[in-house]
Amino acid sequence: MASSTDVRPKITLACEVCKHRNYITKKNRRNDPDRLELKKYCPNCGKHQAHRETR
């Protein structure tokens, strides 16, 4: 079972525009302590949008 202090936890990325949660990925907490933000394709909007880590 994954602990809450896992070094590489699973995170969900949500579109900044439509707020749909489109992607699940992993991140390294030691290298990226802040919230992750990537520009990815949103199938709901139909174009590339900024996706941000959700809690």
UniProtKB/Swiss-Prot annotation:
Name of protein: Large ribosomal subunit protein bL33B
Gene it is expressed from: rpmG2
Keyword NAD: no
Pfam families xref list: Ribosomal_L33
SUPFAM superfamilies named among the record's database cross-references: Zn-binding ribosomal proteins (SSF57829)
Gene3D superfamilies xrefs: Ribosomal protein L33
Protein's GO biological process: translation
Keyword flag Membrane: no
Example of a GO MF term: structural constituent of ribosome
Organism: Mycolicibacterium paratuberculosis (strain ATCC BAA-968 / K-10)
Origin: domain of life: Bacteria
Cellular-component GO terms for this entry: cytoplasm; ribonucleoprotein complex; ribosome
Alphabetically ordered keywords of this record: Ribonucleoprotein, Ribosomal protein
Protein family membership: Belongs to the bacterial ribosomal protein bL33 family.
NCBIfam families, A to Z: PRK00504.1, PRK00595.1, rpmG_bact
Cystine residue pairs: none
